[in-house]
Design a protein with these regions (language model features):
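Exported/periplasmic ABC-transporter solute-binding proteins
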Residues: 1-35, 39-228
């Protein structure tokens, strides 16, 4: 299994280098890439995740408003004292462009507000590296970063960090499933529409939408998608 960034994964699917994706919603450019090549895609939500903000465990701040999160990443808020914390400069980590979490950050948090440019040293290439840096940045509580809920809580558990509530709502399986936590996003299974009915990719795509498939997804630690 080759892991690539979300946008690059869609390129691979459109080019026939991949048969099935389990991914977050892509940038519009990824869908346009497939359309330009005459490739129709089938996207089916199978679970739900969320963008979460993490800080050093010693940081006294426990919650940000949505406006404060935008303020930090637009460069308008630069000190923790402006959001109820100590008088310390905020060191705001970002993800690399084309990563799923960066796409989510721009679409769900920043929306039409431009993100402040971050130097290369504040853009770790991998999510695990970002978490490590937030946990250990000069042994202080200055740092903040963002990742996705499943990765932080299931794949890369790390002492020294904590998740922030947003508007007083702590991210959890329950608040993400219900949509109460504001930065939720579905995770999709994606195949090409012309994938043969008896191919392994099509069979798995269909299986993940069954009750047994949903049970398996939940047993793996993912948030169960609530049927409308």
């Amino acid at each position: 299994i080759t892991h690539t960034k979300t946008t690059e994964s869609f390129y691979a699917l459109a080019d026939g280098a991949a048969d099935l994706l389990l991914v977050y919603a892509p940038e519009a450019s990824a869908l346009e890439y497939a359309e330009d090549r005459g490739v129709e895609l089938l996207m089916q939500p199978i679970t739900r995740d969320a963008l979460v903000f993490l800080v050093n465990a010693d940081n006294p701040v426990t919650s940000l408003s949505q406006e404060e999160a935008v303020g930090i990443y637009s460069g308008k808020i630069t000190n923790w004292s402006e959001v109820g914390g100590e008088d310390r400069p905020i060191v705001a980590y970002q993800r690399v462009e084309a990563s799923g979490s960066q796409v989510m950050m721009r679409a769900q948090v920043m929306k039409d507000v431009e993100m402040v440019d971050a130097p290369t040293e504040l853009r770790p290439g991998e999510m695990g590296e970002l978490i490590d840096r937030v946990a250990s940045y000069k042994n202080t509580a200055n740092a903040i970063g963002y990742s996705v809920y499943y990765y932080v809580t299931e794949m890369y558990l790390r002492e020294g960090v904590k998740l922030l509530a947003i508007d007083g709502v702590q991210p959890s399986n329950e608040t993400i499933a219900s949509g109460e936590y504001p930065y939720c996003q579905d995770v999709y299974a994606v195949i090409r529409a012309d994938e043969p009915e008896d191919s392994p990719a099509r069979i798995l795509f269909d299986y993940l939408q069954t009750e047994e498939g949903r049970d398996l997804i939940e047993a793996a630690g993912y948030v169960r998608l609530v049927e409308e």
